[in-house]
Amino acid sequence: VDAVTGIYVIQATDFLLASVPFALKLERSYYSTNNTVSVLGLGWKFPYASRIYRDTRDVEHTRVHLETITGHSVCYEEQDGRWVNQSKGASRFLMEVQEAEITGQERYVLTDVVDHTLSVYDARGLLQSVEYPNQQSLSFAYGEEGLERIVTPLGNVLQVECRGGRILQITDEIGRRTQYRYEGDLLVDVVHTDEGITHYEYDENGHISSVTDQNGSCYLENEYDVKGRVTRQNFSSGVYQTFTYDDIHHRNTIYYSETGKTEIYEYNNRFLKERIIYEDGSFQTYQ
């Protein structure tokens, strides 16, 4: 749980493949306050589902939005033939529109000056490739149902089965596969490459309320407030944590049943942690 925002976060890696310039990870992430439905269901994100779409609500400006492969949400506005970043904290990204050499169609090229990558999107806004500084690239192919194939810089192929806007299965060249099962918009089971199953239960608002691991152990139960922030976590060992939020004074309090102690987290208007106050009165500051 993020102590400042109260968001319950899951980071999971479903595939790890040898690649260059570094190993390729197929990861998924969950955020309890995320109300969007992705290719992996409500609250989940899959980085290579990144796409660009036009803002049709703003008739006065020409704007596009995208969530990058790094998880940043970015908005660009066209001004005098240039695409100008409208998002705070996202100056690492630069975007331009180019004409594809073969098709002659427009393509969007997003430069990440931190990771030194180029993410290339076609005229439909679909991610076509991620190009690395060593001239290697990761490429993507699509069918009627969505993403069909991922080709790594080493030429290895991952086959992706989609239906109804959801990823159902990813299979590599030696037959290893990860499967995803849903109930409506909710991802309930992930069947891993070793055939173990991680199971997720959800509350009435679509927040993950419990997680059962591949050994069949329900190791975590969550309770939430109306904003999707965790208010209590119960662990299989019997210990628990509670979370209290003071939005007015920007102070959150966490109680740990195992030690009987509390910690107070203070943060600024940008939700950046400024100070942790401990039970004994000592504190740690952040700048």
Predicted regions and their residues:
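Extended charged/polar low-complexity repeat regions
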Residues: 26, 32, 42-46, 53-287
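Intrinsically disordered, low-complexity segments enriched in small residues
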Residues: 1-40
